[in-house]
């Protein structure tokens, strides 16, 4: 069995989780972007990652989820705290790490039950969605603080420091 592709996905996924953690530590959860508070943008991004990375057809919402809590088009009575979002991120990380540890490269071509995309397509779609929202959320931090939240890459050879929350 080959694991070259899965190992590349693992590396990029771990980097994604580090960047999400930095984002959650630096953003203002109450900042309003497109009529919604940033906490809701964070939850939308994390919920999508949780639902779509593995198999959206076999997904169970987290226990705290209520209808439309993940929607950026519908306001919510509930509010999620930074701590709740950080805990949710850690649960997603554990779930996805276990999933990736169960795969080999050949399995990336398989189409999960009920899906139209193969496993690789589902994963790639979440990288795209995740980083689009991370950029939006980090932009609000830049606007408010005039500081650029650190976005970590996979090589660490850019010459930039990899320590701290800001570039």
Provide a role label for each language-model segment.
Residues 10, 21, 26-71, 113-167:
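Short, contiguous alpha-helical
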Residues 13-17, 93:
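Hydrophobic faces of stable alpha-helices that mediate helix-helix packing
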Residues 13, 34, 42-46, 78, ...:
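Generic structural signal for well-ordered secondary structure
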Residues 73-110, 120-131:
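Acidic/histidine-rich alpha-helical segments that form the ligand environment
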Residues 19-20, 81:
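A generic structural signal for ordered secondary structure
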Residues 1-14:
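Extreme N-terminal tail/first-helix region
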Residues 16, 27-31, 103:
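Short secondary-structure junctions and interdomain/linker hinges
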């Amino acid at each position: 069995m080959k694991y070259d592709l899965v190992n590349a996905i693992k590396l990029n996924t771990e980097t994604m989780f580090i960047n999400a953690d930095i984002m959650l530590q630096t953003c203002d959860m109450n900042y309003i972007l497109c009529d919604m508070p940033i906490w809701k943008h964070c939850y939308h991004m994390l919920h999508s990652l949780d639902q779509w990375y593995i198999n959206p057809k076999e997904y169970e919402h987290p226990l705290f989820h209520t209808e439309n809590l993940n929607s950026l088009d519908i306001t919510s009575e509930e509010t999620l705290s930074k701590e709740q979002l950080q805990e949710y991120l850690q649960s997603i990380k554990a779930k996805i790490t276990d999933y990736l540890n169960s795969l080999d490269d050949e399995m990336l071509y398989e189409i999960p039950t009920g899906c139209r995309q193969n496993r690789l397509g589902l994963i790639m779609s979440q990288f795209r969605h995740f980083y689009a929202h991370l950029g939006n959320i980090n932009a609000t931090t830049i606007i408010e603080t005039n500081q650029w939240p650190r976005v970590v890459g996979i090589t660490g050879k850019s010459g930039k420091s990899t320590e701290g929350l800001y570039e």
